[in-house]
């Protein structure tokens, strides 16, 4: 069987590709996402998609980017209502997928939105059910994100340098993501202010944090290793004797619900 597959982004295609191959299902892709804003972000996501195409050599049908199509689709809803806005957006993309599928002779369609941890499967299935009746086409359903697929997909993207976006796509989700980031940052600063008695701003989100050169280890002994969780450096270089006191091993370490690469010297 070969299906017409709407692709929302490269990371979600990674999950869908694996499940489809496991079920011996071939697919033609349709990267249709006029919701993505700004255009530079659209280009980054499309380039990531093309990178996967180069790796897996799948068929593709394309259509020009037109952000106005998304804006028109959400005119009747309150854009601040994320659930209603997203439903309209998904409907628009899935309906366009069905139209293109029929135009190209396909009788079955699906979408990588089923891979996304952000999307509600019941909403997707309800949309699909309506489109099946309206256009006389079949929808292929599979829980692409099941069985730890999201974690495995993230590892694949990291190893293969596949771009992973930080927000859903539209300008409204960009603002929402930025607001969440700001709230998280303020919360971290508030916690750190109780742990550290100096200006720690420059130590937050560092690419490389050296202990004891950048951070006096006394703070770790006084406030606990969770100080690192709130500083969130990408990589930590730590003296062996300090690491031993906290039972830290060379490589990936989990501190609370946060993971970091720690190099012991």
Where is each model-derived feature located?
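Nucleotide-activated chemistry modules centered on ATP-dependent adenylation/adenylyltransferase
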Residues: 1-265
């Amino acid at each position: 069987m070969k299906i017409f597959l709407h692709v929302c982004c490269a990371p979600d295609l990674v999950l869908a590709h694996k499940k489809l191959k496991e079920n011996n299902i071939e697919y033609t892709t349709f990267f249709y996402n006029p919701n993505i804003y700004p255009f530079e972000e659209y280009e980054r996501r499309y380039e990531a998609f093309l990178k996967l195409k180069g790796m897996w050599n799948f068929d593709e049908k394309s259509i020009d980017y037109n952000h106005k199509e998304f804006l028109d689709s959400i005119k009747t809803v309150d854009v601040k209502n994320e659930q209603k806005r997203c439903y309209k957006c998904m409907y628009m993309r899935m309906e366009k997928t069905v139209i293109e599928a029929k135009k190209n002779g396909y009788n079955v369609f699906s979408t990588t939105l089923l891979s996304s941890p952000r999307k509600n499967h019941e909403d997707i299935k309800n949309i699909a059910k309506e489109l099946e009746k309206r256009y006389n086409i079949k929808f292929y359903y599979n829980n692409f994100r099941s069985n730890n697929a999201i974690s495995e997909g993230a590892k694949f993207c990291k190893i293969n340098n596949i771009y992973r976006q930080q927000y859903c796509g539209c300008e409204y989700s960009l603002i929402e993501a930025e607001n969440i980031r700001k709230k998280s940052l303020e919360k971290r600063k508030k916690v750190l202010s109780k742990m550290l008695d100096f200006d720690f701003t420059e130590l937050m989100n560092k690419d490389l944090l050296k202990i004891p050169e950048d951070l006096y280890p006394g703070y770790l002994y006084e406030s606990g290793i969770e100080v690192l969780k709130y500083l969130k450096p990408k990589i930590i270089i730590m003296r062996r004797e300090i690491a031993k006191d906290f039972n830290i091993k060379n490589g990936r370490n989990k501190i609370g619900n946060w993971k970091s690469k720690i190099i012991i010297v």
